[in-house]
Amino acid sequence: MEKLLGQAMPLGCIMVDLESTTLQPHEKERLLDPLVAGVILFSRNYESIEQLQALTTEIHQLRHPKLLIAVDHEGGRVQRFKEGFSMLPAMGQLGKCFRANEKEGLELAQQVGWLMATELLAVGVDFSFAPVVDLDYGDSRVIGDRAFDSDPVIVGKLGKALVQGMRDAGMASVAKHFPGHGYIQADTHLEVAVDHREFQEIAHKDIQPFLKLIENGLDAVMPAHVRYPKVDDLPAGFSKVWLQEVLRQQCYFDGAIISDDMSMHAATEFGDAPTRVTAALKAGCDLVLVCNDPVAADEVLSQVTWETGPLSHARLIRLHGKGHLKLSQLHNNPLWQSRASHVSHFLNSVNQQGLLV
């Protein structure tokens, strides 16, 4: 059957990526597959504000309900779009600000969340995979200053403030990487990661910031591609123990569970891409990322059989952005001007003090 543009089709369960700054014909065809739920964008997909808005508009016009468009736009070293966007501080810098002055730290975190979300929503991006609420134990190469702090109470407070800013702007939040990625040194993009701690230690420390956000209506969680063998032999993103028993039943989380990228090395030991995706879905993920490997993405779409249930679909629909400002209004908006200036001033002061990592 010929696929028609703008056709009514429920969201699926797979998030894919794009090769460049424009949507190619074969990519349009891929995005019209019923299994697809959305697109994750990277730096390679960004050339200019105008180009990005044209790209997101084209993606959103393909289907109804609209495909989700997401990006990793945390701040610091993980900010996919730079020129034309406000530079955002690393979360670790917000943690230092909090320790110097709690009130100022919380206010700044809320403003950073609002600024990040407002600018992305204005160009058609639905949500950012943020905040990182891992704890900074000082040894993790991949987490480091992406984390607010080592103290779970501080991380919970700052995460809550950042999420509130995102929510005020109309953006859903995705807390990562459950149940905690900060303790281990390994980078799961490159290698298998194992955390040998007991469940009680993880629960009393790393899970606490997630609980704080769940209490305040967290929209989504991304599990870690990390093994915790004292709890389950499977990495959290493939584990019914972590996703169903701990996250759903013990933490009372009812939002979306979004897997980390199935192409990361830590996931590849579980068979080919269709096998990995199916395992993650069966474990309890509502949405699975397949990035940086278009062959694997097409294998998944042709071989995986999965029907998104009404509850999963509702969870994903809630991730659609609800921005209040259009791009043409943004720079003339007094609130944007004030918050962009405040965040820029903070970054300048950090640079002057030599606190940048």
Swiss-Prot record:
- What intrachain disulfides are recorded? none
InterPro entries, from UniProt? Beta_hexosaminidase_bac, Glyco_hydro_3_N, Glyco_hydro_3_N_sf, Glycoside_hydrolase_SF, NagZ_Beta-hexosaminidase
- One Gene Ontology CC term in the entry: cytoplasm
Query: What does the record give as the reaction this protein catalyses?
Result: Hydrolysis of terminal non-reducing N-acetyl-D-hexosamine residues in N-acetyl-beta-D-hexosaminides
* Pathway(s): Cell wall biogenesis; peptidoglycan recycling
Positions of the record's site feature: Important for catalytic activity: D187
Q: Name one GO molecular function term.
A: beta-N-acetylhexosaminidase activity
Annotated GO biological process:
carbohydrate metabolic process; cell division; cell wall organization; peptidoglycan biosynthetic process; peptidoglycan turnover; regulation of cell shape
The record's subcellular locations are: Cytoplasm
Task: Supply the EC number(s).
Answer: 3.2.1.52
Q: Which Gene3D superfamilies match?
A: Glycoside hydrolase, family 3, N-terminal domain
Active-site residues, as the UniProt record annotates them:
H189 (proton donor/acceptor), D260 (nucleophile)
Ligand binding (substrate)? D72, R80, R146, K176, H177
Provide the family line.
Answer: Belongs to the glycosyl hydrolase 3 family. NagZ subfamily.
Record PANTHER family: BETA-HEXOSAMINIDASE, BETA-HEXOSAMINIDASE-RELATED
Protein's UniProt name: Beta-hexosaminidase
User: Which species?
Assistant: Hydrogenovibrio crunogenus (strain DSM 25203 / XCL-2) (Thiomicrospira crunogena)
Gene that specifies this protein: nagZ
